[in-house]
Amino acid sequence: LTADLRYILGIPHTKLAIIHRQYFSLAKDLQFAYRLDYQTTLGSNKVPYFAQPELITSFLIAASNQGLGGKSSVRGILRNRVVGDAVGFGNFEFRYKFLRFEWLKQNFYLGTNVFFDSGLVLKPIEMDLSAVSATDRATYFSNYESGKFHSAAGIGLKIGWNENFVISADYGKAFNKQD
């Protein structure tokens, strides 16, 4: 028998996620892949500050599934940089396998990808900023209102082993230095 600590502490909340992924083969060894993700908090209960950045993902990836930004949501944006009661994001990438070879009777490939990722807050978290100076408000909070996109683009390298084990490294650069 297990129970979520949030319910034991009396701070329940519900989050809803709608995730769509699709892959297209454009030519031999060239694919286009995209993911669209919408997440929102349901009900009247407020989400505690420590649980606010949690994102629901297609795969259980522990601490790295927090907030927009980082390898699991918007690559090139600092992890946990963009948080809201409702968020949306998309990942769009072209993948190309440029070298296939056999080694030790195993099939390998090297590939690259170019990507564009973008996310936005659809419903901001209500915060009391009365104690925050106007300068700090302009520096730290001005770009995080509802409807402002946080975007990045980049490139990656993939090493595939027998088509089902892939090591991937991506480097993304945010369009806004504040991200």
Model-derived segments and spans:
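Predominantly the C-terminal beta-signal and adjacent terminal strand-loop region
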Residues: 36, 42, 160-179
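Short beta-alpha connecting loops at secondary-structure transitions
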Residues: 73-75, 137-141, 151, 167-172
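A structural signal for short secondary-structure junctions
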Residues: 83-86, 104-109, 114, 147-151, ...
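Short proline/glycine-enriched turn/loop segments at secondary-structure junctions
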Residues: 102-103, 145, 175-178
